[in-house]
Amino acid sequence: MSQLTIYNAVSEGNDPPLPSLHTTDAAIVAAELSQRGIRFQQWPTHDELDAASSQEEILAAYSAEIAEVQAAGGYQTVDAISLGPDHPQRAELRQKFLSEHTHSEDEVRFFVDGRGLFCLHIGDEVLQVLCERNDWLSVPAGTRHWFDMGERPCFSAIRFFNNQDGWVAQFTGDPIAKRYPLLGS
């Protein structure tokens, strides 16, 4: 179940403040994110797909939705990524994504299966968006954020890019991510 937790990013000390909102209501999640320029949707699921599905199977199953998003957003490159709990680079990848960063393009993800925690640092707030199966999220270019896939990741996601290079991050150097709960904590 998708969920949204909102914190005030300005707090005394190193501990995260108490959340000002915590909800699993998809309509509230979408409305709160929309107020901050973040798009959130839920697409129909394809029950035949799971974390073990190949990139080709995933892209074929969602070809109509992918074409719509590409046409609307001008996305040149689309791929599907799957990461399981036995992936040899899971710890290294997790650490890379846990550092606050921005992108020069929108970060658009659709969770085919599994889950991941997007943490968005917008002004004086940190929004933690737990995305799960059938959640689609679009984070605008320049938004400070980090992502946690957990210690034992298990997800498949479709990624949309406006450039041929794929995922390119500009790290902020801000250690704020260390003050907030991780996926599974």
Swiss-Prot record:
It catalyses: 1,2-dihydroxy-5-(methylsulfanyl)pent-1-en-3-one + O2 = 3-(methylsulfanyl)propanoate + CO + formate + 2 H(+); 1,2-dihydroxy-5-(methylsulfanyl)pent-1-en-3-one + O2 = 4-methylsulfanyl-2-oxobutanoate + formate + 2 H(+). Keywords: Amino-acid biosynthesis, Dioxygenase, Iron, Metal-binding, Methionine biosynthesis, Nickel, Oxidoreductase. Pathway: Amino-acid biosynthesis; L-methionine biosynthesis via salvage pathway; L-methionine from S-methyl-5-thio-alpha-D-ribose 1-phosphate: step 5/6. Its cofactor is Fe(2+); Ni(2+). Pfam families: ARD (PF03079). The record marks D106 as: May play a role in transmitting local conformational changes. Binds 1 Fe(2+) cation per monomer. Its EC number is 1.13.11.54, 1.13.11.53. CDD domains: cupin_ARD. Signal peptide: none annotated. GO terms for molecular function: acireductone dioxygenase (Ni2+-requiring) activity; acireductone dioxygenase [iron(II)-requiring] activity; iron ion binding; nickel cation binding. Fe(2+) binds at H101, H103, E107, H145. Ni(2+) binds at H101, H103, E107, H145. The record marks R109 as: Important to generate the dianion. InterPro entries: ARD, ARD_bac, RmlC-like_jellyroll, RmlC_Cupin_sf. GO terms for biological process: L-methionine salvage from methylthioadenosine; L-methionine salvage from S-adenosylmethionine. The record marks E100 as: May play a role in metal incorporation in vivo. Monomer. Belongs to the acireductone dioxygenase (ARD) family. Catalyzes 2 different reactions between oxygen and the acireductone 1,2-dihydroxy-3-keto-5-methylthiopentene (DHK-MTPene) depending upon the metal bound in the active site. Fe-containing acireductone dioxygenase (Fe-ARD) produces formate and 2-keto-4-methylthiobutyrate (KMTB), the alpha-ketoacid precursor of methionine in the methionine recycle pathway. Ni-containing acireductone dioxygenase (Ni-ARD) produces methylthiopropionate, carbon monoxide and formate, and does not lie on the methionine recycle pathway. This is Acireductone dioxygenase.
